Amino acid sequence: SSGGGDGSGMWFGPRL
């Protein structure tokens, strides 16, 4: 995932 991802497809970080 672009911006931030744990590899499971979830998002976290400055880009939601």
UniProtKB/Swiss-Prot annotation:
Taxonomic superkingdom: Eukaryota
One GO MF term: neuropeptide hormone activity
Main location class: secreted
Disulfide bonds: none
GO biological process, one term: neuropeptide signaling pathway
Keyword hit for Secreted: yes
Entry keywords, A to Z: Amidation, Neuropeptide, Secreted
Subcellular location, record wording: Secreted
GO cellular component terms, A-Z: extracellular region
Signal peptide range: none
Modified sites of kind Leucine amide: 16
InterPro entries: Pyrokinin_CS (IPR001484)
Protein purpose: Myoactive.
Family, as annotated: Belongs to the pyrokinin family.
Name of protein: CAPA-Pyrokinin
